[in-house]
């Protein structure tokens, strides 16, 4: 009986199957990379604000401590946005006629809140507690980056689940002494893993990666 298909058919079939698998894998890879990209996460994108508050000036230049403005960071889940009164503690005397700060003065006079543009916008299904992290040695700059060098704040990290899990699985790589939590210029020492392992034990850190830890 004569052969129905040409002998090259087997090769074409194998190439087609391999090509299909490769194309599917490449598509998945591209989708995942796009999902991690700043285009989706909006990382490193400075946001315009009603008042161009500069962390570079206030933190980097003047040395203002994070807790002066974010007063609840070590006490509650949210770090807190300072009321205008906090701004006016200084700006009632300094730059008190600056047109740039008129929205601050108007907010203070009228008792209305300034509508800041949110930068770190976690989805509603993700729970994050600031106090639980800073009180266990996770520094501000670990998540927020060098805000002392940011004229306008941007989101330094992706805030995606894989980024969170990296720290939850290996906290010894990131934990620091409590005295350095608010030091945004802190650099991990050469023996960070040894130090971190010791601090994880001292602080009683129990890494949790179960879904219910963050999705409540």
Q: Where are the language model's segments positioned?
A:
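N-terminal export/targeting leaders of redox proteins
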Residues: 1-52, 56-60, 64, 68, ...
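Beta-hairpin (beta-strand-turn-beta-strand) motif
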Residues: 58, 92-93, 131
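Soluble extracytoplasmic domains of inner/organellar membrane proteins
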Residues: 124, 129-178
């Amino acid at each position: 009986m004569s052969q129905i298909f040409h002998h090259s058919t087997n090769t074409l079939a194998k190439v087609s199957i391999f090509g299909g698998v490769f194309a599917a894998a490449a598509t998945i890879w591209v989708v995942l990379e796009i999902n991690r990209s700043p285009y989706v996460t909006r990382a490193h994108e400075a946001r315009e604000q009603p008042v161009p508050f500069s962390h570079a000036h206030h933190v980097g230049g003047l040395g203002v401590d994070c807790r002066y403005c974010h007063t609840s960071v070590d006490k509650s889940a949210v770090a807190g946005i300072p009321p205008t009164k906090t701004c006016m503690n200084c700006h009632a005397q300094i730059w008190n006629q600056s047109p740039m700060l008129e929205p601050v003065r108007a907010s203070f006079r009228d008792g209305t809140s300034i509508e800041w543009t949110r930068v770190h916008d976690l989805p509603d299904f993700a729970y994050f507690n600031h106090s639980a992290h800073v009180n266990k040695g996770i520094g501000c700059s670990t998540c927020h980056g060098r805000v002392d060098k940011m004229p306008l704040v941007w989101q330094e990290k992706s805030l995606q689940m894989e980024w969170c899990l990296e720290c939850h699985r290996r906290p010894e790589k990131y934990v620091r002494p409590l005295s350095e939590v608010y030091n945004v210029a802190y650099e991990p020492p050469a023996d960070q893993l040894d130090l971190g392992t010791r601090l994880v034990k001292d602080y009683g850190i129990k890494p949790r990666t179960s879904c219910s830890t963050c999705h409540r």
